[in-house]
Amino acid sequence: MNIILEILLLLITIIYSYLESLVKFFIPQRRKSVAGEIVLITGAGHGIGRQTTYEFAKRQSILVLWDINKRGVEETAAECRKLGVTAHAYVVDCSNREEIYRSLNQVKKEVGDVTIVVNNAGTVYPADLLSTKDEEITKTFEVNILGHFWITKALLPSMMERNHGHIVTVASVCGHEGIPYLIPYCSSKFAAVGFHRGLTSELQALGKTGIKTSCLCPVFVNTGFTKNPSTRLWPVLETDEVVRSLIDGILTNKKMIFVPSYINIFLRLQKFLPERASAILNRMQNIQFEAVVGHKIKMK
């Protein structure tokens, strides 16, 4: 195609996309049904994973629940069964590739082909870099991003065969902005955002438009992962608020889900700020939580 025509098409697409977004802002979008879908949720024994499981249970999905905590995942499954849905609980270490593949083979035999996966399992070690142990850095990447690769690689073939599925990546605003004393966590979440964007582009290039992708990026969430979090500019979110946005995003096939939604505007504007101004803005946020600094626990 002639380069001038391509540029013209690009401009038309940009204008159309903005107009479409404006219309969607005022007109509620149609939500898809997830009834009967086989949904795998990792980290389902607590926090965002548990609440997300309950929302899928309310919508009559078939649930496959993973967590390293046996008691937590079985409690979640029991609550879902009270809602009249089928829930299968598995104890799985999402940092162990062989265990992931073995468990997925078991799920395929016992339940069927997973059609929606929520890669939610995560871990964090708040500390300055020099106080962070090597094995903690390794574990952070194994759980927060490498597990996404192994799970998605194993599930994609059946999704691609049917051109149907949904892959959800639970990341964080920390995947867009570096935070002191969370270097391994931020790095793993940057990787998770990149995984989502790359996978989205690859599926489009392959013509697999029936496989949807979503990426959740909340600010600090009160799940207990980081102790006593606080910020000056952003709220510390409760789990139910985050999950409402996540479920709404999944049901409307939204690609990037920021919570709160206006954080996206902040991140976009920050890219245009001079480095000094950006540093001042970061200080204004006054992000605090308990972290190990110099091998001592301090508020940072």
From Swiss-Prot:
Residues 1-19 form the signal peptide. Gene3D superfamilies: NAD(P)-binding Rossmann-like Domain. One of its GO terms (molecular function) is steroid dehydrogenase activity. Highly expressed in the liver. Also detected in ovary, bone marrow, kidney, brain, lung, skeletal muscle, bladder and testis. The active site is at residue 185. It comes from the Eukaryota. Its EC number is 1.1.1.-, 1.1.1.62, 1.1.1.105. GO terms for cellular component: cytosol; endoplasmic reticulum; lipid droplet. NAD(+) binds at residues 40-67, 189. The modification Phosphoserine is found at residue 33. Changing residue 153 to A: Loss of retinol/retinal dehydrogenase activity. Substrate binds at residue 172. Changing residue 202 to A: Loss of retinol/retinal dehydrogenase activity. CDD domains: 17beta-HSDXI-like_SDR_c. Plays a pivotal role in hepatic lipid metabolism. In vitro, it catalyzes the oxidation of a variety of lipid substrates, including 17beta-estradiol, retinol, retinal, and leukotriene B4. Belongs to the short-chain dehydrogenases/reductases (SDR) family. This is 17-beta-hydroxysteroid dehydrogenase 13. It comes from Homo sapiens (Human). The gene is HSD17B13.
